[in-house]
């Protein structure tokens, strides 16, 4: 074997499973031969070095194959999000040496997501449930036992449409009703058991103010945002493996009437970065800061990127 062939063989062996998937898609001419990824943080805290791994993967895959990685802020929960974190996240990404293509927000798609939800109600694929969260959880069943259908599951379509509009008009208090997708309460995948796709949140949004009172859940916004933007390879950590069938189903629904295989994006999952004796959770780091157990995000000894910028 020549030196060049040996080098090529080594490089080929070094491909990870995501790179293999991307190369296979390119060879088959999928997605018009383009590669587009995204880094989708929620602006509810500062990034930590676990995010740095995801950033390197999202941006690295796009760069390796001549594509683009966009930055999308998953801002669907106004109670926890702030523009302070938006600016800090952008600063951290640039400090790591990367530059995004376009800057997007899930809130850019609130109208499209709302229209999609309305269509699902009209098609009998979603309904308004007036049970509280404890009742809904109790009816979910277990991984080995089917769930119980909500008494509101088969309510008239016009009634659900009217109530959905009231959810967004401010007439409905938080926790009083939700919009659920009508899928399969006996599915072995718990995420298919009529998941909640919209809830009422009356906290003003950092971008849209008080325009919206009904907000999409992550599982409903994530895959559709990928679709709206033209993402080809959606990279997530392993806890989203059980969510992938739901991701695919919602994409099928939003693409209904179109070629399901045309420009079809897929979700791929990878391991989180974990360090011994180190908190690697933005949520838990935020608790430390809010409870004044540390002196701030840039305190030495923690895993936030703020410590290193």
Residue ranges and their predicted role:
Residues 71, 75-77, 83-84, 105, ...:
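Active-site cores that bind ATP or allylic diphosphates and position pyrophosphate for catalysis
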Residues 1-46, 67-69, 102, 168-169, ...:
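Non-catalytic terminal extensions that flank enzyme cores
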Residues 85-110, 116-119, 124-127:
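A glycine-rich helix N-cap at a beta->alpha junction
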Residues 26-27, 63, 94, 121, ...:
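Short polybasic/polar patches that bind polyanions
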Residues 110-114, 272-275:
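Beta-rich nucleic-acid/ligand-interaction surfaces
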Residues 13-90, 204-237:
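N-terminal catalytic cores of NTP/NDP-binding nucleotidyl/phosphoryl-transfer enzymes
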């Amino acid at each position: 074997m020549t030196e060049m062939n040996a080098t090529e063989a080594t490089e080929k062996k070094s491909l990870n499973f995501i790179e293999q998937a991307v190369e296979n898609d390119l060879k088959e001419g999928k997605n018009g031969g383009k590669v587009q990824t995204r880094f989708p943080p929620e602006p509810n805290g500062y990034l930590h070095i676990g995010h740095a791994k995801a950033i390197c993967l999202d941006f690295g895959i796009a760069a390796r194959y001549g594509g683009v990685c966009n930055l999308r802020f998953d801002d669907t929960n106004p109670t926890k999000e702030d523009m302070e974190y938006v600016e800090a996240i952008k600063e951290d990404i640039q400090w790591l040496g990367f530059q995004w293509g376009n800057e997007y927000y899930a809130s850019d798609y609130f109208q499209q997501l709302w229209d999609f939800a309305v269509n699902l109600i009209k098609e009998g694929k979603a309904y308004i449930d007036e049970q509280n969260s404890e009742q809904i959880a109790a009816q979910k069943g277990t991984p080995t036992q089917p769930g119980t259908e909500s008494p509101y599951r088969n309510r008239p379509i016009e009634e659900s449409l009217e109530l959905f509009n009231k959810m967004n008009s401010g007439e409905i208090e938080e926790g009083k009703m939700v919009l659920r997708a009508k899928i399969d309460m006996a599915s072995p995948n718990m995420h298919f058991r009529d998941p909640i796709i919209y809830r009422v949140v009356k906290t003003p949004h950092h971008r849209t103010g008080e325009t919206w009172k009904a907000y999409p859940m992550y599982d409903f916004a994530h895959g559709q945002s990928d679709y709206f933007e033209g993402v080809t390879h959606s990279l997530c950590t392993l806890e989203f493996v059980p969510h992938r069938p739901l991701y695919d189903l919602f994409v099928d629904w939003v693409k209904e009437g179109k070629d399901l295989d045309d420009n079809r994006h897929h979700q791929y999952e990878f391991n989180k970065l974990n360090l011994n004796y180190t908190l690697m959770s933005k949520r838990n780091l935020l608790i430390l800061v809010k409870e004044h157990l540390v002196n701030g995000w840039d305190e030495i000894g923690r895993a936030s990127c703020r410590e290193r910028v």
